[in-house]
A protein has these predicted regions:
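Histidine-rich, glycine-flanked metal-binding segment
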Residues: 1-55
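Divalent metal-coordination and catalytic microenvironments
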Residues: 9, 29, 49, 80, ...
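Di-metal (Zn2+ and/or Mg2+/Mn2+) metal-binding site signature of metallo-dependent hydrolases
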Residues: 53-73
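Functional cores that coordinate and move charged inorganic groups
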Residues: 168, 182-185, 190-312
Length: 443
């Protein structure tokens, strides 16, 4: 007898095959049969008229803290996700020395905008080493599966202490220690190791995250630390994946370590004319196991006056006079005509390719509104609104930021949405079998 039978569901199996109606039998936690099933089960579910699909595996999440206190991992589990991968972008909470706990929280808060107060209250720190962190995850009841990676930021903090994000060159002994910690984590069950080389990632104090400027020698040593272990993965977020030089380094790294490399690009040049995907396909044909990560719909960041970033956060007046004010005081000051005039006359001090030309960036910034649209057109952007109204684009951004109670959020897609659709992604070749993806229905 089966444990469970899901009857008469419309199955979409994830292979690209046409949907079909069938029964699914479960035994001992595994699918035992699919088709017309006449045997009984301890429990049956009538799924007629319902879609039955594989659970989603979300390969890029930041539940590293939440997974230690929330068995449901909402909202992912609400949307059909059955496995989440954490430890991305080089941020996470193990290994950790007691004195560095607040630093790792501040790092996660700055990089991923997860409230530090929630992390401080929720994490009980029943671990120091990475294997102990895995034990803590395993001992906690949960509705869905979790997997994680060893984060570069935590590794550097553990070995280098206060020098972790200010000293770009660790000693040989420190590199050896970090490589051993990576190996220890992967041997204990981590999927691999993650790092970040984007200037977008900073802690709440504005310091670049540990590993941002790590040299190729350090990266290679850490990769070699998990060579040959458990089909390990190396995940890298980078500002430079539109540059041929970066790809040569990545290919050499993959060749020497034998690891599967998965990449996330943060800048438009990597996506222009599908450059990153074409380079990945070329690398695959050369024998390199390199897989870019791609979103099935635009993903990005939300920013506003109540988040850690907005269009004017790099302006001197903001940093020197406004950043420490409470929200009501801040909105009142920003509505002062002289403050507005002063800020609009300034230039950002943020030294980042993506943020250097703020007026151009406004073509990729959209007021979220009460009914969010996550696939907006240019006309919906701040630049589109400014063009329609024949107004200065940064003045429009300023006015939208302080309208109402100053609580408006702005959506900035990342990851190849510069053409205002995902057509290039949808038609890029599949590294697995070279089949062309089918364009989505307009329905």
């Amino acid at each position: 007898m089966y444990d469970l039978i899901i009857r008469n569901g419309t199955i979409i199996d994830g292979t690209g095959n046409d949907r079909y109606v069938a029964d699914i039998a479960i035994k001992d936690g595994k699918i035992a049969s699919v088709g017309e099933i006449n045997e009984p089960a301890d429990k049956e579910i009538d799924a007629e008229g319902k879609l039955v699909t594989p659970g989603w595996v979300d390969v890029h999440t930041h539940y590293d803290g939440q997974a230690t206190w929330d068995p449901v991992l909402a909202p992912s589990s609400w949307h059909g996700v059955t496995t989440v991968v954490m430890g991305n972008c080089g941020v996470g909470f193990a290994p950790v020395k007691p004195k560095d706990r607040d630093f790792l929280i501040e790092l996660m808060e700055g990089v991923e905008d997860i409230p530090g107060a929630a992390l401080s209250e929720g994490i009980d720190w029943q671990w120091e080493s990475f294997p102990e962190y895995l034990d803590a995850l395993e001992s906690f009841p949960r509705a869905i599966d979790v997997a994680t990676q060893v984060p570069h930021g935590a590794i550097r903090a553990y070995v280098m202490g206060e020098r972790c994000n200010s000293d770009y060159a660790p000693t040989k002994d420190e590199v050896d220690q970090m490589a051993e910690l990576v190996r220890e984590g992967v041997e204990a069950g981590a999927l691999g190791f993650s790092s970040s080389k984007t200037l977008l990632h900073k802690d709440i104090n504005g310091e670049y995250m540990p590993g941002t400027f790590s040299g190729n020698e350090e990266m290679l040593a850490l990769g070699l630390g998990m060579k040959g272990l458990n089909n390990s993965v190396f995940e890298l977020v980078s500002d430079h994946l539109g540059e041929d030089e970066e790809w040569e380094w990545v290919k050499d790294f993959q060749k020497q370590t034998g690891l599967t490399v998965t990449l996330i690009a943060t800048t438009a040049p990597a996506y222009k004319n599908n450059k990153m995907y074409n380079l990945a396909e070329q690398a695959r044909l050369e024998g390199h196991e390199i897989r870019p990560q791609a979103a099935g719909r635009p993903t990005g960041v939300l920013h506003g006056l109540q988040s850690s970033f907005h269009a004017f956060v790099g302006h001197p007046t903001w940093k020197d006079e406004l950043a420490s004010l409470n929200h009501d005081e801040l909105v009142a000051r920003l509505r002062d005509p002289e403050t507005k005039k002063k800020i609009l006359a300034e230039e950002t001090t943020i030294k980042n390719e993506l943020l250097q030309d703020l007026p151009s960036l406004m073509g990729q910034v959209f007021p979220l509104g009460e009914k969010p649209n996550y696939e907006p057109e240019f006309k919906d952007s701040v630049a589109g609104i400014a063009l329609e109204c024949n107004l200065d684009v940064m003045e429009v951004m300023y006015d939208l930021l302080v309208q109402g109670e100053g609580k408006e959020l702005f959506y900035q897609p990342l990851g190849g949405y510069h053409t205002y659709d995902f057509c290039l992604l949808y038609t890029s070749p599949s590294p697995r079998d070279k089949r062309q993806s089918r364009m989505p229905s307009s329905a």
